[in-house]
């Protein structure tokens, strides 16, 4: 199957600033946190859990619940959070007639995004070179792949970019095949004379003579 690049329509307002900060509290996509706590009051518990990527064992003089543990873990947590957010936060929705993926890509300009389909998979790629922000210099790059539902025509996949920096990729689902109504075929009966045809009738008459 050939690769197809999906063009996306720009829905951004003229005042859009591609390098604006990202505010998790204003995005409903942040509810799918990929392991990142949604609410600030959960962070202190998350810091003390050895399973999270930025866990650092506290010093002997500080307890796990003390402020020293949070202070010690904060830099590592910030790095882990940045890794999570730089790859984008996405959600998948499927209704009876449509499949849709929404991905937060507000860190990227439209020309830095690529959407394409190949062998039943949608691939979204974003990349920007190193540039300066309020914290220093940063470069970002991500690739996300989503498997299309069975039967979806890849040529019907479309995408759009909202003013809030949300990339939406969607495709119509194939309609279910409806079974035809049941039809009863009547059986017709033929007489013996009709089965043999006219010649059979003549032979029977000559035999009687």
UniProtKB/Swiss-Prot annotation:
Mark the residues carrying the PTM Omega-N-methylarginine: 12
* Residues with PTM N6-acetyllysine: 127
GO cellular component terms attached to this protein's record: axon cytoplasm; contractile muscle fiber; cornified envelope; cytoplasm; nucleus; plasma membrane; proteasome complex; spindle
- List the PROSITE patterns hit by this protein, alphabetically: SHSP (PS01031)
Q: Which GO terms describe its biological process?
A: anterograde axonal protein transport; cellular response to vascular endothelial growth factor stimulus; chaperone-mediated protein folding; intracellular signal transduction; negative regulation of apoptotic signaling pathway; negative regulation of oxidative stress-induced intrinsic apoptotic signaling pathway; negative regulation of protein kinase C signaling; positive regulation of angiogenesis
- Quote the InterPro entries the UniProt record gives: A-crystallin/Hsp20_dom, ACD_HspB1, Alpha-crystallin/sHSP_animal, HSP20-like_chaperone
Q: Where in the cell is it found?
A: Cytoplasm; Nucleus; Cytoplasm, Cytoskeleton, Spindle
Q: sHSP domain: which residues? A: 80-188
Q: Does the keyword Glycosyltransferase apply?
A: no
Interaction with TGFB1I1: region residues: 74-209
User: Where are residues bearing Phosphoserine located in the sequence?
Assistant: 13, 15, 27, 86-87, 90, 102, 180, 203
List modified residues, type Phosphothreonine.
178
* Summary of the knockout phenotype: Mice are viable and fertile with no apparent morphological abnormalities in tissues under physiological conditions.
Identify the SUPFAM superfamilies for this entry: HSP20-like chaperones (SSF49764)
| Keyword set, alphabetical order | Acetylation, Chaperone, Cytoplasm, Cytoskeleton, Methylation, Nucleus, Phosphoprotein, Stress response
Give a short account of what the protein does.
Small heat shock protein which functions as a molecular chaperone probably maintaining denatured proteins in a folding-competent state. Plays a role in stress resistance and actin organization. Through its molecular chaperone activity may regulate numerous biological processes including the phosphorylation and the axonal transport of neurofilament proteins.
Q: Which family does it belong to?
A: Belongs to the small heat shock protein (HSP20) family.
Q: Which PANTHER family match?
A: HEAT SHOCK PROTEIN BETA-1, HEAT SHOCK PROTEIN HSP-12.2-RELATED
Describe, as the record does, how this protein assembles with itself and its partners: Homooligomer. Homodimer; becomes monomeric upon activation. Heterooligomer; with HSPB6. Associates with alpha- and beta-tubulin. Interacts with TGFB1I1. Interacts with CRYAB. Interacts with HSPB8. Interacts with HSPBAP1.
Q: What is this protein called?
A: Heat shock protein beta-1
Origin species, per record, is Mus musculus (Mouse)
Species lineage, top-down? Answer: Eukaryota, Metazoa, Chordata, Craniata, Vertebrata
Gene name of this polypeptide: Hspb1
